Regions:
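A short acidic-Thr-Gly-centered motif at the start of a beta-strand
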Residues: 162-177
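ATPase nucleotide-binding head domains, primarily ABC-like/P-loop NTPase cores
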Residues: 180, 188-193
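Short, polar/flexible loop-turn hinges at active-site or ligand-entry regions and domain interfaces
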Residues: 1-2, 198-204, 222-226
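Conserved, non-catalytic sequence blocks in retroelement Pol enzymes and Pol-derived host proteins
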Residues: 59-60, 203-205
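Generic long, charged, amphipathic alpha-helical segments
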Residues: 206-233
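Conserved "right-hand" nucleotidyltransferase catalytic core of DNA-directed polymerases
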Residues: 1-161, 177, 184-187, 216, ...
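Residue-level signal for well-ordered alpha-helical positions
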Residues: 169, 193-194
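A short, glycine-centered helix-capping/turn motif at helix boundaries
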Residues: 243-245
């Protein structure tokens, strides 16, 4: 432990200090334009949702939304709780394919989250030097991973087109570039080495897709027929085992 502290943790703390001090440059005007674009789309969706429902209501109110969807519009699959119908994402996602209003509501929720958390939230952290100086936390997570707060710059969206656009407001200083480097499934490779699991070792030696292999076995599906969703779920299981699922 002393060796780990002296040779890894202490040198890393200096690097994190330099990263916090340097910060990351943000294009304030582009961030504002991004927020404005979100507002335009949010307003479009709000109008669309109200028209489909036949009345105006507070889309952000779970109680009102539940009553509109499951009582006024008669959608099937509603789950009633003590406080009203559940409008949790997992409930609505099951209804979205057959009910356009539900798909619009899910998009509305996603965009309002982007607006409040990123378009508005990040703007509050831009300092006089035009940079955001996040805090990197070295000793908070149980897994030993570094976390980021005020704001969290390690969780910038990338799954949707609008989500990815937020990344474009972060820019390097003149004559510099951003680079991206990531170990390929490092935790599972370490697990293969420590455990000595022959199948896992062979999978990595042959450059096989370990997540697709797991999905194939878990879902009893031929390897070639594994869907992207099944692979993502298997990936969560694989890494979950490493982190104590």
């Amino acid at each position: 432990m002393q060796k780990l502290f002296d040779e890894i943790e202490m040198p890393v703390s200096r690097v994190l200090y330099e990263m916090e001090k340097e910060g990351v440059l943000v294009r304030r005007q582009e961030l504002q334009a991004y927020g404005d674009a979100l507002v335009d789309r949010i307003n479009e969706l709000e109008t669309k949702i109200h028209e489909a429902a036949g009345c105006e209501f507070n889309i952000n109110s779970p109680k009102q939304l539940g009553e509109i969807l499951f009582e006024k519009m008669g959608l099937k699959g509603g789950k009633k709780t003590k406080t009203g119908y559940s409008t949790a994402a997992d409930i609505l996602e099951k209804l979205a394919a057959d009910n356009p209003i539900v798909a619009d509501i899910l998009e509305y929720r996603g965009l309002t989250k982007l607006k409040s958390t990123y378009a508005d939230g990040l703007a509050d952290y831009i300092e006089e030097d035009g940079r955001i100086h996040t805090s990197f936390n070295q000793t908070i997570t149980a897994t030993g991973r570094i976390s980021s707060t005020e704001p969290n710059l390690q969780n910038i969206p990338m799954r949707t087109e609008l989500g990815r656009l937020i990344r474009k407001v972060f820019v390097p200083k003149d004559n510099y570039l951003f680079t991206d480097a990531d170990y390929s499934q490092i935790e599972l490779r370490v697990l293969a080495h420590i455990s000595g699991d022959e199948q896992l070792i062979e999978a990595y030696k042959s450059d096989a897709d370990i997540h697709r292999i797991t999905a194939s076995k878990v879902f009893h599906t031929p390897f070639e027929e594994v869907t992207d969703l099944q692979r993502r779920n298997a990936k969560a299981v694989n890494f979950g085992i490493v982190y104590g699922i």
